């Protein structure tokens, strides 16, 4: 496993729509392992392939049980409720803004071997599912905020 360089806001790759994964091979497994290692080293909650320079529909997300889920070709199939809270991004370091997302999200995705499964999450996990899947369509959370939060506002939240 290796830690990959995280692409920062302003890089054009973060605005591109990712292509589906069709080959479930050793290269994919290596990328998934590297993405998980990168997520752990960055102390993040989620990471999408374009954030490490790869235009494929792949994300890794920390779930409600503190396990890292690998989501390949993911799609949101159900949402419920609403939550508004501070959100940040490894590609926009040190900046946070208030974003409204569903309180509960269920996704359908493939695992590293191509098998379809469903995963669900509340609160932070639901937020991460939405945030990371948005990356796969070339969107950043900054499109949903009025302004960045000050350090004081973030500490008081």
What are these model-predicted stretches?
Residues 1-157:
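Positively charged
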